[in-house]
């Protein structure tokens, strides 16, 4: 049988599922050992094998396995040693057009990087990665490459399934952060505003209404004469540098003093940028939200800044105008 065709057949049929029933008979193959490979099932293009989202209220573990594919059983234990490979993150991001950050060492602990495939078996004991939730600085996804470093005895490693690119992120079940005191906040700038006084609320419509501690008043962009569409932006000066984990954005209500969101115009997609000097800006998040009266969003990674800018790029109902009733940071 042609060696190349046989290897392709073996890879397609056995590599991922492992060789549960090694063959002892004559397959007209010159070198059965040439079809023996070590790999990790966590390297397979299957999110269930390589991704994890876990609640940041508690620590958790992620298991990585070594696997054996063969025609003839090696008849001995196989020890597979893994190592983390942060140096592979940049190449992965370039190939996949992603921008994952390498997982910081403080975020995980691996007690033993060795996995043993017992004689007669084709799946190893797990390598347990213990995730330290307290070290995660947001809900962003970290990339942790785990590569097969050494195999004893010296069996070959699959060139395509020898490294698992683990993508791990946390979520908050409830918000653990306190709102930042807004007493020193001010509006530093905005795209447009449309004053629209309501009975008892003379400043309604102005940009300052987005931070006035009155949930029914709102900042509204122009609509009477000029009717500019998105993007609409507002810049807030917090008065001093603060550590930011996320924001709560309240939309305009209809009726005015209710908790029912207006059917159109509230933010649907918005960017958040931060700055220390109101001149040089860094993008820290882009968010898509539903038309709820309040939306809570978390940064991928915490940021420290004095200024933040919210830029609405699309609105509910694709209306040209937008409104924000209240902005809180935490």
Where are these regions (language model features)?
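C-terminal motif of bacterial Sec signal peptides marking the signal peptidase cleavage site
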Residues: 15-18
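Acidic/polar, low-complexity intrinsically disordered N-terminal segments immediately downstream
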Residues: 20-110, 118, 122-124, 135-142, ...
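Short edge beta-strand/loop segments characteristic of extracellular beta-sandwich folds
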Residues: 65-69, 130, 237, 250
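Short proline/glycine- and polar residue-rich coil/turn motifs
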Residues: 115-123, 288-292
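Disordered, acidic Ser/Thr/Pro-rich linker "stalks" and the adjacent N-terminal cap
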Residues: 165-237, 252-264
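Extended extracellular/luminal ectodomain segments enriched in beta-structured repeat modules
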Residues: 229-231, 239-248, 304-306
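A short beta-strand element within beta-rich, extracytoplasmic domains
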Residues: 242-260, 310
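Trp- and acidic/polar-enriched beta-sheet ligand-binding modules for extracellular glycan
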Residues: 258-330
């Amino acid at each position: 049988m042609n060696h190349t065709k046989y290897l392709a057949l073996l890879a397609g049929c056995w590599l991922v599922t492992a060789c549960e029933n090694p063959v002892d008979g004559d397959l007209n193959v010159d070198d059965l050992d040439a079809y023996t490979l070590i790999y990790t099932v966590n390297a397979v293009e299957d999110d269930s094998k390589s991704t994890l989202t876990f609640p940041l209220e508690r620590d958790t573990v992620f298991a990585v396995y070594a696997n054996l594919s063969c025609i003839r059983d090696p008849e001995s234990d196989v020890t597979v040693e893994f190592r983390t490979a942060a140096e592979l993150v940049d190449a992965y991001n370039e190939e996949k057009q992603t921008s994952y950050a390498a997982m910081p060492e403080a975020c995980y602990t691996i007690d033993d990087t060795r996995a043993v495939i017992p004689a007669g078996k084709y799946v190893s004991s797990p390598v347990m990665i213990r995730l330290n939730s307290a070290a995660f600085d947001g809900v962003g996804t970290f990339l942790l490459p785990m590569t097969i470093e050494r195999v004893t005895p010296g069996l070959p490693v699959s060139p395509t399934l020898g490294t698992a690119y683990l993508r791990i992120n946390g979520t908050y079940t409830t918000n653990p952060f306190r709102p930042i005191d807004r007493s020193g906040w001010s509006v530093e700038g905005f795209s447009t505003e449309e004053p629209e006084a309501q009975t008892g609320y003379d400043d309604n419509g102005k940009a300052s209404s987005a931070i006035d501690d009155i949930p029914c008043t709102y900042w509204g962009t122009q609509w009477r004469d000029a009717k500019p569409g998105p993007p609409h932006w507002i810049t807030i000066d917090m008065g001093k540098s603060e550590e930011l984990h996320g924001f709560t954005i309240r939309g305009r209500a209809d009726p005015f003093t209710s908790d029912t969101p207006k059917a159109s115009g509230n933010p649907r997609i918005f960017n958040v940028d931060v700055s220390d000097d109101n001149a040089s800006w860094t993008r820290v998040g882009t968010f898509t939200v539903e038309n709820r009266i309040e939306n809570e969003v978390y940064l991928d990674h915490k940021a420290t800044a004095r200024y933040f800018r919210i830029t609405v790029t699309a609105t509910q109902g694709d209306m040209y105008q937008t409104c924000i009733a209240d902005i809180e940071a935490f």
